[in-house]
A protein has these predicted regions:
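A short, gly/pro- and small-residue-rich
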Residues: 158-164
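N-terminal small/polar loop signature for handling phosphorylated ligands or for N-terminal nucleophile
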Residues: 11, 18, 68, 72-158
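An N-terminal, well-structured beta->alpha segment
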Residues: 1-98, 102
């Protein structure tokens, strides 16, 4: 167990959330700098806005690519989108919804505008695709649903994450 488990955050752990969010909108990644490119790891794209590694331009590009991918695969069902409490999750959520709406993608969000746990998004997709029915879960065909979860998971508070 970590020696600080269960202890209050220390001053050096705290972030300036306004600085983090402003950097999300204000800093523009340079495609010539490898650390500023979109990079998908084992669980989506993660990075920090202050490092120009998770910014609005990244989310616009990733979401536009998802729209193109959905079209190429014939995925035309609801896209479920959720977010967690990290500081960059809400701005990335808003950006993604704007891109999806502009592309005409039917999108489902929490009715209260609240945070949505990853398992809730996964469960919604499975139900929409036939889980619990006699036919079972579909993986192709008209009306197929999918989703986006905006969370860097266990990463530090200054980070953002985007998973499809």
């Amino acid at each position: 167990m970590h020696p600080r488990a269960g202890q209050p955050a220390q001053p050096e752990d705290l972030i300036d959330i306004d600085e983090v969010i402003n950097a999300y909108y204000d800093l523009v990644p340079d495609p010539a700098v490898p650390e500023q490119k979109v990079v998908f790891g084992t669980s989506g794209h993660r990075g920090a806005s202050l490092d120009t590694a998770f910014n609005e331009a990244h989310i616009v590009a990733i979401t536009a690519a998802i729209v193109e991918y959905r079209r190429s695969q014939g995925t035309d069902g609801v896209l479920y989108i959720g977010r967690d409490t990290h500081g960059l999750s809400e701005p990335a959520w808003r950006t993604a919804i704007e891109v999806l709406a502009g592309a005409g993608v039917t999108t489902a969000v929490d009715a209260r505008g609240a945070y949505t746990p990853t398992p809730a998004v996964s469960h919604s997709i499975l139900l929409a695709n036939g889980a619990g029915t006699e036919a079972g879960v579909r993986t192709t065909g008209p009306g197929l649903a999918d989703g986006i979860v905006i969370t860097p998971s266990h990463n530090p508070p200054r980070d953002g994450g985007f998973k499809y």
